């Protein structure tokens, strides 16, 4: 793979060559620091100071050139504004056409400047990561924090493209006013809903979107999905080349089929929750065996996530076909277990359903095949489909209140979820076979691991100690064997990449070795919230029947209402709260709220009431939803870039952590059932409380490294 140094040289704008980051010089300087430290000619503080000074100089050069170009663009726009004013008094169609072309020419030059900024931003991120990798020290966070927060920050100029918004606005507004050659002047401010059909403005908007990493609802929802992305090579291409490269891979109907698969699988997961205890008792088992029935699907998913993730390296269509067939038969077995009076058949059916979990394929399709400009929306759609399926599953179960037989086959509230889902998967299979298009793959396509584009520009990789002084007390230079492993050839600037430093992890052990303490804590938090949510949902029918005598319909309504909170809560957090507070602050506050919800759920001395259960359940569930979104947002930033590709990627690790939590939670419910239903609630909540307290302590310990 051609590395960044050569790409920068090939794709830089020739007349602006001297204003780009001198990546080769910076890289060579990093290489020289090693021997100098070994012989004692330089100490650690001097290295950090010297490297910071060099990088400051490079950023200043870039920032000042940006300001100069902004000034030139602004001057041209001012002259065009004067020309525009004269045409308002005496409209001339030919002059209006020329004026539009003049604005488009400015827009094209603005695109060049945005591409210049993009290349330099990538270069700065890469050289910071190279310094961290070579010396085993997380310098990135210290540098970014001290420079970005300064009132006269030049780093902000580069990464936040300060001032360019006014230029973009001027071009967009004037082209919008001139879009009608009849002389009708329409303002984007007065009528913002009016579409502007101009390819230049569309290209500018896409370029700005690539550079902008501000938090909003779609961004928050996209990170909630933890779609691991690897598009740095693509980002460094001009927009027209990006579109050409993406063409042939994206197919709207195929994306829709992946989202439908996500939705149906979540419906399949939760449709049995309200009736699992009743089904278990009808087969002669205890009500608490519902934990095993519900958890069997999660057990199988532990294995299916791995082989589906590996299978998606070669195909997307075949795994989805296999998933649909397995889920069809799984639901068929689940429904037939009633007439065969077989608990074993019931569990086998649920295991089959778990073996059909293709969520890894759904995630992978979005990260690999959906164009950058709509990937955030697609990722948010993945989360929304999951949330909608989670809400619709129990609601659908509540509607299946009937009991009849056709020949010797029973259709009642216990078996109908299986029959309905079997039909749904059969119809989906037909739709899939007709409409899905396998994406085009490049010859010898290699999924290499680079910096994830979902990573916030300002975050870099997390500093494990969050303190520059603490870092200075550690050995700055790693063993020569390790540094040589990551070194790149500087002879001709071609920068051959080290295979080991870029290739994806090839096993769980290799993936685990890439996990920093910050990432481990985030996975622990994910485990905790999934455990707490599974306890709440899976035992709801048993607990509410025992304490309140709720019917299956009442349980369905309760679970449906819980599911409906997912999207509104994420909307509030993604659009408002995350703009007022840091992610790590929201993370810690959400953990505390989950802990409060768990504590309030305990049955201690006083009679257990419906308001106590419902209020504590909503506090726990809503807080866990907020926590999940923020947790995955942070996880996508602090996780190694090598985990953005391959079979054992970050998405798989988080899925496995959550699935293991669900398996243990469901097993806990069944085991606690041996102590009697009166003890079930408190016994299952106690592990949740312990894990939650541990996760809060771990978060406090790594708080300074969560950026």
From Swiss-Prot:
Domain (SPX): residue spans on this chain: 2-145
Transmembrane segments: 252-272, 283-303, 320-340, 342-361, 380-400, 416-436, 523-543, 557-577, 586-606, 614-634, 679-699
Domain of life: Eukaryota
Molecular-function GO term, any one: transmembrane transporter activity
Record has Transmembrane helix as a keyword: yes
Localization of this protein: Membrane
Pfam families listed in its UniProt record: MFS_1, SPX
Keywords, ordered alphabetically: Membrane, Transmembrane, Transmembrane helix
SUPFAM superfamilies in the cross-refs: MFS general substrate transporter
Residue spans of biased composition, Acidic residues class: 481-498
Bilayer topology annotation: Multi-pass membrane protein
Cellular component terms per the entry's GO annotation: plant-type vacuole membrane
Keyword Transmembrane helix (UniProt): yes
Family named by the database record: Belongs to the major facilitator superfamily.
The protein, known as: SPX domain-containing membrane protein At4g11810
Organism: Arabidopsis thaliana (Mouse-ear cress)
């Amino acid at each position: 793979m051609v590395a960044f140094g050569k790409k920068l040289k090939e794709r830089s704008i020739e007349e602006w060559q001297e204003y780009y980051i001198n990546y080769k010089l910076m890289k060579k300087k990093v290489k020289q620091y090693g021997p100098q430290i070994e012989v004692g000619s330089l100490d650690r503080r001097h290295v950090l100071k010297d490297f910071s000074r060099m990088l400051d100089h490079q950023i200043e050069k870039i920032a000042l050139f940006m300001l100069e170009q902004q000034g030139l663009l602004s001057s041209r726009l001012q002259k065009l504004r004067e020309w525009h004013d004269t045409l308002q008094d005496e409209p001339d169609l030919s002059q209006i056409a020329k004026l539009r072309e003049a604005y488009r020419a400015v827009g094209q030059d603005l695109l060049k400047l945005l591409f210049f900024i993009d290349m330099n931003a990538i270069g700065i991120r890469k050289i910071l990561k190279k310094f961290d990798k070579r010396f085993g020290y997380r310098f990135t966070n210290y540098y970014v924090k001290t420079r970005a927060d300064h009132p006269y920050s030049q780093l902000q100029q580069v990464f936040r493209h300060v001032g360019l918004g006014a230029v973009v606005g001027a071009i967009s507004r004037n082209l919008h006013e001139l879009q009608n050659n009849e002389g009708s002047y329409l303002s984007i401010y007065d009528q913002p809903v009016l579409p502007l059909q101009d390819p230049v403005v569309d290209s500018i908007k896409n370029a700005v979107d690539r550079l902008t990493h501000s938090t909003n609802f779609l961004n928050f929802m996209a990170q909630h999905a933890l779609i691991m992305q690897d598009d740095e090579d693509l980002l460094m291409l001009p927009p027209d080349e990006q579109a050409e490269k993406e063409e042939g891979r994206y197919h709207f109907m195929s994306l829709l089929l992946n989202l439908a698969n996500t939705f149906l699988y979540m419906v399949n997961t939760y449709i049995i929750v309200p009736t699992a205890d009743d089904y278990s008792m009808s087969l002669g088992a205890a009500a608490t065996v519902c934990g095993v029935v519900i958890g069997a699907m999660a057990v199988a998913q532990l294995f299916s996530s791995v082989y589906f993730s590996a299978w998606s390296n070669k195909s997307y269509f075949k795994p989805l076909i296999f998933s649909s067939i397995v889920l069809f038969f799984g639901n068929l077995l689940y429904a037939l277990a009633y007439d065969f009076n077989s608990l074993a058949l019931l569990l086998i059916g649920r295991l089959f359903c778990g073996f059909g979990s293709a969520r890894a394929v759904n995630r992978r399709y979005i990260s690999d095949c959906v164009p950058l400009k709509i990937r955030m929306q697609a990722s948010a759609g993945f989360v929304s489909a999951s949330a909608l399926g989670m809400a619709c599953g129990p609601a659908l179960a509540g509607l299946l209140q009937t009991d009849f037989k056709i020949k010797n086959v029973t259709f009642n509230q216990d078996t109908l979820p299986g029959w309905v889902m079997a039909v749904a998967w059969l119809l989906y299979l037909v739709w899939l076979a007709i409409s899905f298009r396998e994406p085009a793959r490049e010859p010898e396509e290699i999924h290499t691991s680079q910096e994830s584009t979902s990573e916030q520009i300002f975050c870099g990789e997390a500093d494990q100690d969050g303190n520059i002084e603490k870092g200075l007390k550690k050995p700055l230079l790693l063993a020569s064997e390790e540094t040589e492993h990551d070194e790149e050839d500087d002879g001709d600037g071609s920068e051959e990449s080290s295979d080991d430093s870029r290739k994806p992890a090839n096993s769980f052990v290799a993936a685990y070795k890439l996990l920093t303490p910050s990432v481990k804590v985030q996975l622990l938090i994910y485990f905790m919230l999934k455990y707490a949510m599974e306890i709440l949902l899976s035992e709801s029918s048993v607990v509410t029947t025992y304490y309140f005598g709720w019917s299956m319909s009442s349980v369905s309504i309760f679970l449906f209402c819980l599911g409906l909170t997912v999207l509104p809560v994420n909307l509030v957090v993604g659009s408002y709260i995350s703009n007022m507070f840091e992610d790590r602050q929201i993370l810690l506050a959400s953990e505390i709220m989950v802990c409060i919800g768990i504590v309030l759920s305990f049955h201690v001395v006083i009679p257990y009431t419906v308001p106590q259960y419902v209020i504590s359940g909503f506090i726990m569930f809503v807080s866990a939803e907020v926590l999940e979104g923020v947790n995955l947002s942070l996880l996508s930033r602090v996780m190694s870039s090598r985990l953005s590709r391959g079979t054992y990627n970050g998405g798989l690790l988080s899925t496995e952590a959550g699935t293991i939590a669900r398996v243990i939670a469901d097993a806990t419910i069944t085991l606690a059932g041996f102590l009697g239903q009166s003890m079930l609630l408190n016994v299952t909540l106690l592990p949740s409380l312990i894990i939650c307290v541990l996760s809060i302590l771990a978060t406090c310990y790594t708080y300074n490294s969560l950026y």
